[in-house]
Curated annotation (Swiss-Prot):
This is Beta-1,4-galactosyltransferase 7. Glycans are attached at residue 154. N-acetyl-D-glucosamine binds at residues 226-229. Signal peptide: none annotated. It comes from Homo sapiens. The gene is B4GALT7.
């Protein structure tokens, strides 16, 4: 969308009736009574929809000793219509913002409304997916992005692999459709922390076609770090050209970094053979091998900004990657 703001990356080597009204209405029913009844019906309908989408209804029934028939009903995969759907000035493409997440609620409360405002000002059709890992394994950012890719709406045609603690501040940053190749928004020249030339983390845009071509990301990286370096090799192996922003003059003030290492410790432990394995290229696994279960899918509004929270339970083959647990 903004070709003047993109450049090829300069590299070293070129994801019946209601029970509330049973028995009918009394003969003399005031307008006030009708209003209260309608309001109550609306409230309980919304409450039932929320519980049924999150799976809480099934859990509540089982808690009362009753059996449910089949798994909890999944919410519709398509996000609700947005105000821009009929506005051609917003362009034909739609972005799925994939946010790997675990226990960073303070950052999330800032991230969702900020990204909503930022992308709306740029007229980027989008929907935010919070990929919340709820199993007991170590955090796996790459596998969560694979899940987000598979579970995102078919109406989206490109993705942003987006850290929850990195907020774009410069309005000239391009979040448009990356037709020519993967676009690394948080380039080494602009990221507040990481400056090596092969870095592709933080914020990376890819078309869904190109992400499939790379077979997604490796699922072998449990704990913090290195999954982006392996994905860089996948990008090059797929024959794709990596692009980065050009003409941005705000330097390391281009983004706001929310992470506080003093109270938000990262899991940087290397267990068993993980230290040796982390530098290898996973030539077999990826999008086609990720194993998971979506425990619930819930539509939320954070500060008036809509998003979808996927509670995800990843599966780990402890024979192949014993470092997925701390034991």
């Amino acid at each position: 969308m903004f070709p003047s703001r993109r450049k090829a990356a300069q590299l070293p080597w070129e994801d019946g009736r209601s029970g509330l009204l049973s028995g009918g209405l009394p003969r003399k029913c005031s307008v006030f009574h009708l209003f209260v009844a309608c309001l109550s019906l609306g409230f309980f309908s919304l409450l039932w929809l929320q519980l049924s989408c999150s799976g809480d209804v099934a859990r509540a029934v089982r808690g009362q000793g009753q059996e449910t028939s089949g798994p909890p009903r999944a919410c519709p995969p398509e996000p609700p219509p947005e105000h821009w759907e009929e506005d051609a000035s917003w362009g034909p493409h739609r972005l799925a913002v994939l946010v790997p997440f675990r226990e960073r609620f303070e950052e999330l409360l800032v991230f969702v409304p900020h990204m909503r405002r930022f992308l709306s000002r740029k007229k980027i059709r989008h929907h935010i997916y919070v990929l919340n890992q709820v199993d007991h394994f170590r955090f796996n950012r790459a596998a969560l992005i694979n899940v987000g890719f598979l579970e995102s709406s078919n109406s989206t045609d490109y993705i942003a692999m987006h850290d929850v603690d990195l907020l774009p501040l410069n309005e000239e940053l391009d979040y448009g459709f990356p037709e020519a190749g993967p676009f690394h928004v948080a380039s080494p020249e602009l990221h507040p922390l990481y400056h090596y030339k092969t870095y592709v983390g933080g914020i990376l845009l890819l078309s869904k076609q190109h992400y499939r071509l790379c077979n997604g990301m490796s699922n072998r990286f449990w704990g913090w770090g290195r999954e982006d370096d392996e994905f860089y090799r996948r990008i090059k192996g797929a024959g794709l050209q990596l692009f980065r922003p050009s003409g941005i003059t705000t330097g390391y003030k281009t983004f706001r970094h929310l992470h506080d290492p003093a109270w938000r410790k990262r899991d940087q432990k290397r267990i068993a053979a993980q230290k040796q394995e982390q530098f290898k290229v996973d030539r077999e696994g990826g999008l086609n091998t990720v194993k998971y279960h979506v425990a619930s899918r819930t539509a939320l509004s954070v500060g008036g900004a809509p998003c979808t929270v996927l509670n995800i339970m990843l599966d780990c083959d402890k024979t192949a990657t014993p470092w997925c647990t701390f034991s």
